[in-house]
């Protein structure tokens, strides 16, 4: 079933000019990039996006990291896009990620792991709506 999911190419990757290489991995996996924008997250945007982690000890560091430099927000489309992109990203800890995954190829650490991807269709819809209007998404 064709689905949409949300992706962020994080500051550790944009700082190293890896957007094109990451996009190539995404597209080689059969996902289409149907919307993409480079943005500098505000403190308020990052706090809202990561509010699920507000009580976690790493929350402040996460918000600071995500607002330090530009990110690339994306809408990806394809068969079983949520699950497929999570497989393409690899494990959160790059040491545990499978060969050929984005995190194995590009992540610097568990904290600077290069990409975010939605964990469910419901969250994908919520996350997409935070950054894109319907008319921004061109399938």
Swiss-Prot record:
Cofactor(s) the protein needs: Mg(2+)
Pfam families the record matches: NDK (PF00334)
GO biological process entries: CTP biosynthetic process; GTP biosynthetic process; UTP biosynthetic process
Catalytic activities: a 2'-deoxyribonucleoside 5'-diphosphate + ATP = a 2'-deoxyribonucleoside 5'-triphosphate + ADP; a ribonucleoside 5'-diphosphate + ATP = a ribonucleoside 5'-triphosphate + ADP
Record EC number: 2.7.4.6
GO molecular function: ATP binding; metal ion binding; nucleoside diphosphate kinase activity
InterPro entries the record matches: NDK-like_dom, NDK-like_dom_sf, Nucleoside_diP_kinase, Nucleoside_diP_kinase_AS
Localization: Cytoplasm
Any one of the GO CC terms: cytoplasm
Major localisation: cytoplasm
Keywords from the named record: ATP-binding, Cytoplasm, Kinase, Magnesium, Metal-binding, Nucleotide metabolism, Nucleotide-binding, Phosphoprotein, Transferase
Keyword Zinc-finger among UniProt keywords: no
Chain positions recorded as ATP binding sites: 10, 58, 86, 92, 103, 113
Subunit (UniProt): Homotetramer.
Cross-referenced NCBIfam families: PRK00668.1
Function: Major role in the synthesis of nucleoside triphosphates other than ATP. The ATP gamma phosphate is transferred to the NDP beta phosphate via a ping-pong mechanism, using a phosphorylated active-site intermediate.
HAMAP family: NDP_kinase
Name of the protein in its database record: Nucleoside diphosphate kinase
